[in-house]
Amino acid sequence: MSGPNGDLGMPVEAGAEGEEDGFGEAEYAAINSMLDQINSCLDHLEEKNDHLHARLQELLESNRQTRLEFQQQLGEAPSDASP
Protein backbone atom coordinates (compact mmCIF):
# COMPACT_ATOMS: atom_id res chain seq x y z
CA MET A 1 0.00 0.00 0.00
CA SER A 2 1.41 3.43 -0.85
CA GLY A 3 1.46 6.49 1.42
CA PRO A 4 0.23 9.99 0.58
CA ASN A 5 3.38 10.76 -1.43
CA GLY A 6 3.34 7.45 -3.29
CA ASP A 7 5.94 5.95 -0.94
CA LEU A 8 5.46 2.43 0.26
CA GLY A 9 3.76 2.38 3.64
CA MET A 10 5.89 1.33 6.59
CA PRO A 11 4.49 -1.07 9.15
CA VAL A 12 3.96 0.48 12.59
CA GLU A 13 6.52 -1.85 14.20
CA ALA A 14 9.21 -0.86 11.72
CA GLY A 15 8.44 2.81 12.27
CA ALA A 16 8.86 2.41 16.02
CA GLU A 17 12.16 0.56 15.56
CA GLY A 18 13.50 3.09 13.07
CA GLU A 19 12.66 6.12 15.21
CA GLU A 20 16.34 7.09 15.14
CA ASP A 21 16.19 7.23 11.34
CA GLY A 22 13.61 10.06 11.48
CA PHE A 23 14.45 13.72 11.65
CA GLY A 24 17.65 14.37 13.52
CA GLU A 25 18.83 17.51 15.20
CA ALA A 26 20.51 18.72 11.99
CA GLU A 27 17.28 18.38 10.02
CA TYR A 28 15.33 20.27 12.68
CA ALA A 29 18.00 22.98 12.72
CA ALA A 30 17.81 23.26 8.92
CA ILE A 31 14.01 23.49 9.00
CA ASN A 32 14.21 26.04 11.80
CA SER A 33 16.68 28.10 9.77
CA MET A 34 14.41 27.99 6.71
CA LEU A 35 11.43 29.04 8.81
CA ASP A 36 13.48 31.93 10.22
CA GLN A 37 14.35 33.03 6.67
CA ILE A 38 10.70 32.82 5.62
CA ASN A 39 9.68 34.79 8.70
CA SER A 40 12.29 37.44 7.92
CA CYS A 41 11.05 37.72 4.32
CA LEU A 42 7.46 38.02 5.50
CA ASP A 43 8.46 40.74 7.98
CA HIS A 44 10.21 42.62 5.18
CA LEU A 45 7.15 42.31 2.94
CA GLU A 46 4.92 43.53 5.75
CA GLU A 47 7.15 46.58 6.25
CA LYS A 48 7.05 47.36 2.53
CA ASN A 49 3.28 46.91 2.51
CA ASP A 50 2.90 49.27 5.48
CA HIS A 51 5.12 51.83 3.75
CA LEU A 52 3.13 51.58 0.51
CA HIS A 53 -0.13 51.87 2.42
CA ALA A 54 1.10 55.04 4.13
CA ARG A 55 2.24 56.52 0.80
CA LEU A 56 -1.11 55.70 -0.82
CA GLN A 57 -2.95 57.32 2.08
CA GLU A 58 -0.83 60.46 1.58
CA LEU A 59 -1.56 60.43 -2.15
CA LEU A 60 -5.27 59.99 -1.52
CA GLU A 61 -5.33 62.92 0.89
CA SER A 62 -3.32 65.05 -1.54
CA ASN A 63 -5.76 64.23 -4.35
CA ARG A 64 -8.70 65.13 -2.11
CA GLN A 65 -7.13 68.48 -1.29
CA THR A 66 -6.38 69.18 -4.96
CA ARG A 67 -9.94 68.28 -5.96
CA LEU A 68 -11.37 70.58 -3.28
CA GLU A 69 -9.11 73.41 -4.45
CA PHE A 70 -10.22 72.93 -8.07
CA GLN A 71 -13.86 72.86 -7.01
CA GLN A 72 -13.37 76.07 -5.04
CA GLN A 73 -11.60 77.75 -7.97
CA LEU A 74 -14.38 76.74 -10.35
CA GLY A 75 -16.98 78.03 -7.92
CA GLU A 76 -15.13 81.33 -7.45
CA ALA A 77 -14.12 81.85 -11.10
CA PRO A 78 -17.32 83.64 -12.22
CA SER A 79 -17.21 86.09 -9.33
CA ASP A 80 -13.49 86.80 -9.89
CA ALA A 81 -14.03 87.42 -13.62
CA SER A 82 -16.43 90.32 -13.06
CA PRO A 83 -14.83 93.81 -12.66
From Swiss-Prot:
Chain residue ranges for the region called Disordered: 1-24
Localization in the cell: Cell junction; Cytoplasm, Cytoskeleton
GO terms under cellular component: anchoring junction; cell junction; cytoplasm; intermediate filament; subapical part of cell
Main location (coarse class): other
Coiled coil residues, start to end: 25-74
Any one GO BP annotation for this protein: multinuclear osteoclast differentiation
Modified residues (Phosphoserine): S82
Keywords: Cell junction, Coiled coil, Cytoplasm, Cytoskeleton, Phosphoprotein
One example GO MF annotation: molecular adaptor activity
Record Pfam families: UPF0184 (PF03670)
The protein's role, per its UniProt record: Essential for intermediate filament organization in intestinal cells, interacts with intermediate filament and regulates intestinal lumen morphology.
Family the entry assigns: Belongs to the UPF0184 (EST00098) family.
Name used for this protein in its record: Bublin coiled-coil protein
